[in-house]
Amino acid sequence: MTRTVLREVRVYRDGAFGAPEDLVVDGGLIDSAPADGPGAVSGGYLVPGLIDCHVHLYGPETLSALAAHGVTTGLDMSSPAPLVAALRGLPGTTDIRSPLMAANSPASAHAARMKDIPAFDDALVAGATHADAWVDRHAEQGADFIKVVIDLPGFDQETVDALVGAAHARGLKVVAHAARSDAVAMAQRAGVDVLTHAPLDRPVGPDQAAELVATGTVIVPTLAMMQGIVENLAAKGVPGPVYEPARASVATLHAAGMPILAGTDANATPAAPASPVFGESLHDELALLVDAGLTPAEALDAATGIATEHFGLADRGRIAPGLRADLVLLADDPTVDISATRTVRGVWIAGERVVGAP
């Protein structure tokens, strides 16, 4: 790996950019050595590599699209084990984590929509008595966490509880697909670690928000996806939900102190109710988070340091010596205007420049 010097960059730390400084990258890590030698770039705003906490892998082109928009880590939320294995650790591409296939009830609407996806049978859990074996199989195949789709109709509470208990017994966090308020309540009773999606039917209220915060639950609201669902149904003339409950839920949860993580639900699945675009949609998501009440710096943290804290990615998400050199150089300051995350001048993944002139 080559040694790289970035000169006169303003580095994002603790919610703000500092005075211009020189930064050294060596061996794929951020180095504290003196910044001697020629500089690869000069000037700009340097932020940690962005993390999309909800994507669905499709192929190498998925990773290329993510990287082009500054997304250096993607948290897949349901993909067949062979696909995940083929995409893990590819040099110079977005790094990934995955639960492999998400747990689905054979009776759920989600399963009916997704039944033609390759290896979807591996996602099905017949009931609570099958939870241990299902989680064991996914853990043995290398799942980084477990995802449970809570759909109504779908799993009963006993099965959700069993899946969460089996995952926690193996030291794995649990992400719950919960796009309706009753699904959020089921996830809450089961003690999941991460909620994904913000409900479209009814907003989370202050009391429930306080209870969720007390248990340490966090949320990836995927506002870009929720907005896309609403817009797609409206375009078809189909009576459906409105976006405001999702936005209001984020505002309430944020006010209650819940950590908000940025994720899009980017996918290329024909049966999906909406398909946010890989990479580009994360910038849309950050803007929607700001619209829901986060400051631009809080939205940026939702796609960097806060995301790493809750998915066990301690080697990234901040800019400090010894950490993985996943970096994005911007032309403008995103703490002033969050749309500046789109002004990408350069992207480094594990110290290798993948966007911008070498």
Predicted regions and their residues:
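Divalent metal-coordination and catalytic microenvironments
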Residues: 9, 28, 43, 54, ...
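Divalent-metal coordination cores built from histidine and acidic residues
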Residues: 64-172, 208, 215-228, 232
